């Protein structure tokens, strides 16, 4: 989806401009691990999750402002910073910081309304 591409580009350029280190899983060093995006197909609500280690400290307020200024078809309803210091290469959270909004979005399917969070399993196939 075009919104996801815009968000990915924004986040990539933000960290590239600031020369922020990416996580090297073999050495277990670096800051930026993953970007997780979730979007409700019918609602257009979007959750943005930036997953990092705690090895560095960065103020993500300006990233939040850049994301919220993007011209999107849908709407960002939540921006989260998840801290993950696990050795495994999996998206999980040792600590979650809500930078903006809420930690869930809604999706509707067959007249039902579902509340979907970061780690919800939702597979409407």
Where are these regions (language model features)?
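Accessory RNA-recognition modules of RNA-modification enzymes
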Residues: 1-124
